[in-house]
């Protein structure tokens, strides 16, 4: 199995409390997820996130239906939270959301540790490109929401 790390950073023109609260509201994930994924949160319609909370999503990857179950493993508002995939397309997925207080701005750092099935060629041909596109869309969406 092949393990990888993806890291992105973004400066958002809003204070850390507002930015963290945006991330802590599950329905906002729909606003920063590309439409091509047909992303939908299933089950409980939580207003906010907390440690131990489990979320189930449905999406489409390359036109294939995918179910994803994740758990909030760490919750340290307004500085950090970590979600872990319990079931889904990856063999392993740990997503660290880190927020740095810069006064009137916030630096958002995403670090994802993940393991893919089917080896490095599958990662190179599909997964890496998909993740870059997804996180680029997220950056653009966050810019439109906070920096407009």
Where are these regions (language model features)?
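A short, structured loop/turn motif at beta-sheet edges
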Residues: 15-16, 48, 73-79, 98-107
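Beta-strand elements of well-folded, non-transmembrane domains
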Residues: 12-14, 61-63, 74, 89, ...
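A non-catalytic, amphipathic alpha-helix used as a structural packing/dimerization or gating element
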Residues: 133-141
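Glycine-rich portal/gate segments that line the openings of hydrophobic small-molecule binding cavities
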Residues: 40-87, 140-145
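Short, surface-exposed coil-to-beta transition loops
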Residues: 5-7, 65-69, 92-95
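Hydrophobic ligand-binding cavity/cleft-lining segments
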Residues: 1-46, 50
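Beta-strand/loop substructures that line and gate deep hydrophobic ligand-binding cavities in soluble
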Residues: 84-133
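Hydrophobic pocket/interface hotspot
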Residues: 18-23, 29, 55-57, 72, ...
């Amino acid at each position: 199995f092949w393990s990888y790390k993806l890291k992105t950073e973004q400066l958002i023109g809003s204070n850390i409390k507002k930015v963290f609260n945006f991330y802590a509201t599950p329905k906002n994930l729909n606003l920063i997820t590309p439409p091509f994924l047909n992303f939908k949160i299933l089950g409980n319609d939580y207003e906010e996130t907390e440690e131990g909370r489990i979320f189930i999503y449905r999406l489409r990857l390359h036109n294939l239906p995918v179910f994803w179950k994740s758990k909030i493993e760490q919750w340290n508002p307004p500085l950090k939270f970590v979600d872990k995939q319990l079931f889904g397309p990856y063999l392993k997925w740990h997503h660290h959301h880190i927020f740095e207080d810069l006064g009137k701005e916030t630096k958002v750092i995403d670090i994802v540790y993940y393991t893919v099935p089917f080896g490095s060629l599958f990662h190179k041909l599909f997964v890496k490109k998909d993740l870059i596109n997804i996180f680029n869309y997220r950056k653009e969406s966050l810019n439109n929401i906070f920096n407009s």
